[in-house]
Amino acid sequence: VDYIGHRAGHMLVPGLEWEGFDYLRPERRKTRAVMNIGGENLPVVIADRMDGGVKSSSEFTPDYIYCGRALPEKREECAYIIDADMYQGEENTYPAFPYNQLPLVSAIQAPLKFLFLPFGAPSDEYLACLKQHPEIVVISQSNHQNRLGEQRALIHELMCNGLLNPVVIFQHYQHSQEEKSDFQLEAAADMGPLMFDGLCDGVYLFNNGSLSHDDIDATAYGILQAARL
């Protein structure tokens, strides 16, 4: 209750609702599949391993692992995401761009690219980039007091402009292992409405704390299972 209550009195999110959206009968947003993300594919899980961790639970193996600036020496049997300026075209590895590096997107060849994108980024630039690059999957991020509202606004902006790029939702937290239940409740509160509205092609949960990777990955899969349309 306190977590949701903190959104009260937040700054206005100046978004527009796509005219074809129906809150009473939501359908999954139409997207063009990029490899196994979007389209008719089930939503994916991206896991964070910037701390160098390599071992995942056999029960909750992520589809993709974001490793930041360097690939681990020992890799798991899944795909990897690495910062675009460190990308060397390694097998089963794909580049991720921050929104302020849009000019670099065309310079790198890859069948799948990720773009970290907040609502409020210069829309003319990123909309043109997404239209030109259907291989991009958007990773929606937000630091807004009501980040659920801001992430929903970003996806509606994509729909209003006829874009079919898939969207993965990035959520960040700061919890210790002892606060596992708080993490689970907050992640479910942030992700549930976006999942039920059919706006999400994947989940990326990040925690700056002592929570185990297995607990974070299990939470992501639990949210997907509970909210499946």
Feature map (PLM): residue ranges:
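Catalytic alpha/beta core domains of metabolic enzymes, predominantly
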Residues: 1-18, 22-26, 102, 109-229
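Active-site beta->alpha loop and helix N-cap motifs at the rims of alpha/beta catalytic domains
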Residues: 6, 11-12, 20-149
